[in-house]
Design a protein with these regions (language model features):
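Terminal targeting signals and extreme-terminal segments of soluble enzymes
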Residues: 1-170
């Protein structure tokens, strides 16, 4: 897991070099950085780790995150809280955009919409937030996602507009 890898500038990239996951986006393009996260070569982002999301698919402009729903995530009516679903979708939507960005550029959410089609419960099983980039410009990008179960049932859909920033180390 700490096997050195080479970044685009020829420098070694290991977990020890990057105590915080955000640091990798300063040196690597988004697709390479997300691929390293998927393979466990660099740490997950704090929210992904805390929410126990798994990064299932990483391709240019396409990312899939998964989550196994459980009762600890329920709201008062007995389904997974909408904020949890929205967080999973936001993670996928933003990562899809990040996957098309060069090193030193980051994207953050400006606008986020989630439409809930049916409740998610523990009985639903693993759900997948499948996100794709619709447009990536110089300053903004848009992405769309579907939250689906393994059987293909759609539980939510969403879209996001993100601002693209030049990341400058503090």
């Amino acid at each position: 897991m700490t096997t050195p890898r080479s970044d685009s500038a020829g420098g070694a990239v290991t977990i020890k070099n990057y105590p915080h996951a955000m640091d990798i986006f300063r040196r690597l393009d988004g697709l390479e950085a997300l691929g390293m996260m998927q393979r466990g070569e660099v740490p997950k982002t704090p929210i992904t780790r805390w929410m126990n999301f798994s990064l299932e698919t990483v391709e240019r402009g396409h990312v899939v995150f998964a989550m196994l729903p459980h009762e600890d995530l329920y709201n008062m009516i007995g389904s997974v809280h909408g904020g949890i679903i929205t967080t999973l979708m936001d993670n996928a939507l933003g990562s899809a955009v990040q996957s098309v960005l060069p090193a030193g550029r980051v994207a953050t959410t400006m606008d986020l919409h989630t439409r809930f089609h049916r409740p998610v419960t523990a009985a639903t099983g693993k759900v997948f937030a499948d996100a794709r980039v619709v447009h990536a410009g110089r300053r903004t990008a848009t992405s769309e996602a579907h939250l689906v179960a393994a059987n293909g049932t759609v539980y939510a859909t969403g879209s996001s507009t993100l601002i693209i920033l030049e990341d400058k180390p503090a």
